[in-house]
């Protein structure tokens, strides 16, 4: 196969026009097989999954903190509200509004060119930006799940002598988790696709690997199609796993 590629490449250098099949083979070989370029794509996939996982974990942690603050504030009686919690609630609301109301690309550029301008680890900066952005959306997912639990459950826990945090972690959250987890699965899929944005700031994920190949071959079609196909396969795989997980949750609810 390599010998055939070299022979066809020599014909191109000599000005000879290739037929469709030969041209297809040369471009495909250049994009994926020449100098083992497929390894760059594999490395890019690994980085993409790592960035997505880091962003999701960070998003869940930040989202849970924000959701707990907002739910805790909302559940206080109007004339007996903690002023400190009120400040945290206001900060949380403003943060969520700003993050959800501004483009992800702008947030990435601010993180890389302003906040972490001296950092050269663009991949981790991108993961951090994605995680903070995800936290705003995850907070609404978790808050919605917690608020969907019957308020009487909190009152019942408090009447048994449990404090707020114990009631929340032992009674409320276990009930809310069933509605929260499927939505978090969808957030993971969204993060997986959004991870391609970090290539703009130099994050070395899948699209970055494809751009490296394009810069050498001056042929964008196969690298970009390869990236699109890889993302499609990953999304379909995780969507199938998520659907299976949701079916199991539904079955357990019926028992």
What are these regions (language model features)?
Residues 1-255:
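Transmembrane alpha-helices and adjacent helix-loop boundaries
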């Amino acid at each position: 196969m390599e010998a055939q590629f070299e022979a066809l490449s020599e014909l191109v250098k000599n000005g000879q026009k290739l037929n469709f099949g030969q041209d297809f083979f040369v471009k495909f070989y250049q994009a994926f097989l020449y100098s083992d370029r497929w390894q760059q794509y594999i490395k890019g996939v690994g980085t993409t999954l790592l960035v997505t996982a880091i962003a999701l974990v960070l998003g869940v942690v930040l989202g849970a903190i924000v959701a707990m603050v907002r739910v805790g504030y909302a559940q206080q009686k109007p004339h007996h509200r903690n002023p400190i919690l009120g400040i945290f609630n206001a900060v949380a609301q403003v943060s969520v509004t700003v993050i959800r109301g501004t483009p992800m690309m702008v947030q990435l550029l601010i993180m890389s060119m302003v906040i972490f301008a001296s950092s050269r680890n663009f991949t981790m900066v991108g993961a951090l930006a994605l995680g903070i952005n995800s936290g705003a959306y995850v907070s609404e997912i978790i808050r919605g799940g917690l608020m969907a639990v019957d308020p009487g459950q909190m009152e019942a826990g408090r009447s048994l002598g449990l404090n707020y945090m114990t009631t929340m972690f032992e009674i409320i959250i276990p009930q809310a988790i069933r509605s929260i987890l499927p939505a978090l699965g969808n957030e993971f899929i969204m993060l997986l696709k959004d991870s391609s944005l970090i290539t703009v700031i130099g994050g070395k994920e899948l699209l970055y690997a494809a751009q490296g190949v394009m810069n050498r071959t001056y042929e964008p079609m196969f690298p970009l199609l390869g990236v699109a196909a890889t993302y499609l396969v990953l999304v379909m795989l995780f969507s199938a796993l998520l659907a299976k997980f949701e079916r199991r949750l539904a079955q357990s609810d019926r028992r």
